[in-house]
A protein has these predicted regions:
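PRPP-associated nucleotide enzymes
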Residues: 1-183
Length: 183
């Protein structure tokens, strides 16, 4: 990993969602979440590290009482291809029993990660599981679930920015970009 590799990735990408569109989407999602579970005192779980940026943008707009925690699991490990192995690094530390749980993630790609989270949260006794993602990728194959709240639908390309990375780089971008070449 080095600066030149990061710049090479950026040079072989294009912006597909502007920063203004991202911000407007965050406000829209917050309004929908508030209308649905604003009175439920939900437990909000952020999936680290991809959801860090999305979570930081969304939480200030959720102007109702909630509890916050994070979980950490991965399928990608700084590559552009998902692995079938789910690796849990941090499970929920707050009790989910009899709670409405809202899980925040950067992107719902094939849906395997969110489905694994859903299954574990429900097995732990949650009353209701919900998910919010900044992006859902359009795929030809069926997914095990779709998010309850979604900012954007993106094409079946490798996307990054707003918390999503390309080989570990560019999570910090305020826009969403897509690779234009297979690198």
């Amino acid at each position: 990993m080095n600066r030149e590799e990061a710049l090479h990735i950026f040079e072989h990408s294009e912006e597909i969602v502007s920063a203004d569109a991202v911000n407007a989407s965050i406000v829209r999602m917050a309004d929908a979440i508030r209308a649905d579970i604003g009175d439920a005192f939900p437990l909000v779980l952020s999936v680290m590290g991809g959801a860090a940026v999305f979570t930081g943008m969304l939480l200030p707009h959720l102007d109702f009482p909630l509890e916050f925690d994070y979980i950490h699991l991965t399928r990608y490990r700084n590559t552009t291809q998902g692995s079938p192995d789910m690796h849990w690094r941090v499970a929920p530390r707050e009790s989910v029993k009899d709670r409405v749980v809202l899980v925040l993630d950067d992107i719902l790609d094939e849906g395997e990660t969110m489905a694994a989270i859903r299954d574990r949260i429900l097995d732990m006794g949650a009353k209701r599981f919900m998910s919010a993602v900044l992006c859902e990728k359009t795929l030809a194959k069926a997914k095990p679930l779709h998010p309850d709240f979604c900012g954007f639908t993106v094409p079946d390309r490798y996307v990054f920015g707003c918390g999503m990375d390309a080989k570990g780089y560019w999570r910090n971008l305020p826009t969403i970009r897509a690779l234009t070449a297979n690198i």
